[in-house]
A protein has these predicted regions:
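Kelch-like beta-propeller repeat domains
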Residues: 25-311
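Bacterial Sec-dependent N-terminal signal peptides
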Residues: 1-30
Length: 311
């Protein structure tokens, strides 16, 4: 057989393989991407407390222990709004509901938190909900404890390393086996935003919290954070918040930053994120979902338009 004939046979074979591959692809019906859906349900309104309708709480510790949703502590104005002279009340109450049972109702548990607290951070762990920092009307705390649910009974595990400084209104997220915490304030008497950035290695918790280089931006409290991939590495993302000082200075922030633990470095994000005091959730491979937040500071009044419900 001549070389020319061999080449023609090989060429025809390649064309046949290409045709078969193309035909196979065209014969497979296109698949519809799996989309995540959000369904809102307002049936989980908190139960009456002390024979009064529950107006809800802000800044509570919350999370799931198995199928049980836990809400603990928090603060509210039970008697009057703040612009009408109402005083803020801090709570140590713990609520629990099993979300898998259609007839399940909220329980106000007989056990309570070690003290009335709000505006700390909650991290869901396999063993329970880790509660970090927080404040009451007079001071901020560096307490760290875990709410556990054992045989239907609440157990408070205080065998956790305290924060290096008291902090409230910080933001924290779990990234792998490490908890990252950023910002917040150290005092209620003289509230001022900080640039603290701490990490706790859950595999070496006896070493306590370690301070890391902070982001290249302004101090902040009421910020939003989450962990998500940047396309290469799992990273800690920090968004928005507000900068405030003892002299009354206050500024709403819309910037964002990403911390890469592998590189031990920060990078400023180009976009604007007006999500102060909102929530952020990782979704998909490398997306982040923002829930609510405050795009600008508006004085409290009966005519307040309410907070942002944008997602």
């Amino acid at each position: 057989m001549s070389n020319t004939v061999k080449i023609e046979i090989i060429f025809l074979a390649c064309l046949l393989n290409l045709f078969q591959a193309t035909a196979s692809k065209e014969s497979i019906p296109p698949t519809t991407p799996r989309l995540e859906k959000i369904k809102w349900d307002n049936s989980l309104t908190l139960p009456d407390l002390d024979d009064r309708p529950n107006i809800g709480v802000a800044g509570a510790f919350s999370g799931f222990i198995g199928d049980n949703l836990i809400i603990a502590g928090g603060a509210n104005f039970p008697n009057a709004t703040p612009w009408n002279g109402g005083n803020k009340t801090y709570w140590n109450t713990i609520y629990c509901i099993n979300i898998t049972q259609p007839t399940s109702k909220w329980l106000v548990l007989p056990q309570s938190m070690p003290k009335a607290l709000a505006y700390g951070n909650s991290i869901e762990l396999p063993t329970g909900i880790l509660c970090i920092g927080g404040c009451d009307s007079t001071q901020c705390y560096n307490d760290v404890f875990q709410i556990q649910l054992i045989d239907g009974q609440i157990n408070i595990d205080t065998n956790w390393p305290a924060l290096p400084v008291p902090l409230a209104n910080a933001t924290a997220s779990l990234l792998g086996d490490k908890i990252y915490l950023a910002g917040g304030q150290k005092s209620m008497e003289k509230p001022e935003a900080t640039k603290h950035f701490f990490v706790l290695d859950l595999n070496n918790r006896n070493k306590g919290w370690k301070e890391l280089p902070s982001w290249p931006g302004e101090p902040r409290g009421y910020a939003v954070s989450t962990s998500q991939s940047d396309g290469f590495d799992k990273c800690f993302y920090l968004f928005s918040g507000r900068n405030y000082k003892i002299d009354g200075y206050i500024k709403a922030l819309t910037d964002g930053y990403v911390f890469n633990p592998r590189l031990n470095s920060w990078k400023k994000l180009e976009q604007s994120f007006p999500v102060m005091a909102g929530n952020a959730l990782p979704t998909g491979a490398n997306h982040i979902l923002f829930l609510g937040g405050v795009p600008q500071l508006i004085p409290g009044s009966d005519d307040h338009p309410g907070f942002d419900n944008t997602i």
